[in-house]
C-alpha cells in the first residue's frame, strides 16, 4: 500500500513539474517587450548622445523592441547598430525578466577639436575621430591650419594627451596652429605672444626647457 501511494505521489509530482515547465516556457515565449530604458552615462557633463537619438536609430533599422516578443529581440544586433554612431564609445543592451530592454551607453570623450580645410571634427581619448555635435561644444584645445586626419590621430593626439596630464601646459595652451610644413605654433590663453614649437618631435623636452627658462 505504501509503495502504491509513493508511486502515485511520484507520478503526480512528475506531472506537476512537466506542467509548470511547459506553462512557464509558453509564458516566456508569449512575453513582449514592455519598455525600452536608456541610461547615457555622463549625460550631465557631455551631451553628444540622447535617448531620442538612440530610439530614432533603432526605429530606422526596424530594431525598436517595444511590443516585440522578447524571444525575437536580438540584443547583439541592437548593439551593433548603435555602435555605428560615432559619438558612442561603448554600449550594452540586455533583457530583464520583467520584459524590459535596457541600454547602457558611454559617450566618447573628446580631447581635441580640429577646424581646417580637411574637416571639422573632434579627436577622442582613444585616438579616433568623432563628429562635431550641433547641441554641445566641448571645452578642449582648438587646432587649426593645415591638419590632415592622419596627423590629428597620431602626433596631435599624443600632444593632447600630454596636455591633459600636465596641469601647467593645459592651463597655458588654448589653440594650436599647424603650418603646411608641419611646423607648429602654440597660442596661449593669456597674452598676444605665440610659442614656436617647431615639429612635434621631442615636444615634451622642448616644453620642459621652455618652462625652465620661464621660471628663471
Residue ranges and their predicted role:
Residues 1-69:
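N-terminal membrane-targeting segments
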Residues 43-84, 134-161, 198-200, 204-208, ...:
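Periplasmic/extracytosolic POTRA-like scaffold domains at the N-termini of outer-membrane
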Residues 66, 83-89, 164-172:
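Short secondary-structure junctions
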Residues 104-180, 195:
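Extracytoplasmic segments of membrane-associated envelope/inner-membrane machinery
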